[in-house]
Amino acid sequence: MYKKYLLLLACGLILTGCGGGGESESTFDSNTSTSGNGNGNGNGNGNGNGNGNGNGNGNGNGNGKYLVVPKDYDKPDGDKVRIYYTIHPATSSKQRIGILLLNFGGPGATAADRLLSKVSSMPTSITESFDIVAMDPRGAGKSAFARELMTCAVGGSCDSTYKEISPYMGSNAVIQDMDSLREHLNEDQINYLGYSYGTRLGALYAERYPTKIRALVLDSSMSPLHQNYEELRIDQAQGHQKIAEYRLDSKPKSMAKLDDIVTQTKDSDYTANDGGTIKKDDVNLILGAIKHPMREYLNNLRGISWSESKLGLSLSALFDKDEAKPFICWRTQCETESNSLSFSHIPKESFTSDEKRSSAMFRSVMCTDERATLDDSDIEGNEDKYLASSSIYGYYLKENLSGLCKGWTAQRSPIASQSEIKNNITEQVLIVGGLYDPQTSYNWSVEMKDTINNAALITIADTVGHGFSYNGIGSCLDDIVTNYLLEPEVKVTDRKCERVKRISYRYSNEAPTVPVNSAHSGDIHL
């Protein structure tokens, strides 16, 4: 089902995915679906019961708990499933405002096991004021359907499993779980901070439950315009091209050379003037590395610009002097260039069980959510649309990521349309978008801002990155997000923020490592 690069790139193109929970199946609930009165046993340090109305819970490992909810919300008295969540209580009962629900993106990743790390990056005013909550969505972590997805993904075929569970694990089901959790916690409203795919969940929740949302932050937003997966990827190509233009300092000759190399290597190798040979896999590596956000952060640590990095210099030689050997030299050393950090986009030979589960979940949710479905023939024949979006990245995305929903036969649960979001969300919403975001293109944040009648857009202008709030961009952004969460009724205006000059990451033996609370860690989906 997956093309050569599909599993790898699907795991790297949306904020979290292909991991996030443990790889051991023992971390999953052994009984994710119950029937009758909804009774189900919790695991870990405690047991819990559900009573059919979705308001039961049991303590799991650590601070985790289970919420019992309907498998199918259209049949509230039918089978029940359990949703795992964790809470970091507000540290000041006097300052407490309510709950702040976090979603780090996906679809495919956990959330509960990342909560404490994220809390550590938040200011005291937020941790004092909110019970901070993270919920593993259906299909991930310790929540329902995670075991089923892992089993079928490891076995190599999920078609029959998709037919059984996908109708009950799309975004519509998740936002209903979110509201069940709100009710269970006896809260009138929620505050929400969602990254990447989490912005889809936040917007859909606010559309369906407009009176139940107090504050809504959509960081690295998905677009409300995309009606299916192919539209998303086609649109993403032009966002990637903008990043290439930014990386190459908007040099027309460099962009033209890159375009020529991409075109030639579709059918044959490219031989440069110095005798070096560039193959199609090399081009995939180049295109992936140009848009990879961690390049930016590693360079920041070293105090150098993109053009001063080894990769930047080797590509300058290739594009400006038609010399391929510097890039070939870089390619052979790229695994050690950054010590513990690898940026190779060469397909992995193997994936962990949880990476496979995550990729299967990604397909399940993205295809279930589609509003306008495409015939297989339409998907196969859409290369011209990819190339119209970007002559450089169009073929790259078409070859490696198109066709995710080809052959999909499971029942869908279409998400709300742009007009429904526009008509039903009335409270002020804060949107954060990166001008050079490789996962959720900047125009998607603009489209979300234009859709919501009362919204402000904070633009991160000078970095290739994804997921920005409380992730090291600096006080310009974090203060805006914090003040909005504390007082969402205060009007926020559009503005630009720039990252701090140098981002400090944790170090181990003086080698930079990715902070586990970072939205830029290697487990990025949308």
Describe the role of every protein-language-model region:
Residues 258-423, 517, 524-525:
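Alpha/beta-hydrolase fold active-site neighborhood
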Residues 20-152, 254-264, 409-413, 456, ...:
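Catalytic-loop region of hydrolases
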Residues 425, 431-433:
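Short beta-strand/loop motif that positions the catalytic acidic residue
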Residues 464-475:
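Catalytic histidine-centered segment of alpha/beta-hydrolase-like enzymes
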Residues 206-260:
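A catalytic-pocket lid/entrance helix-loop region that shapes and gates access to the active site
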Residues 174-190:
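Conserved acidic catalytic loop of the alpha/beta-hydrolase fold
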Residues 15-17:
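C-terminal motif of bacterial Sec signal peptides marking the signal peptidase cleavage site
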Residues 438-443:
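Conserved alpha/beta-hydrolase "acid-adjacent" motif
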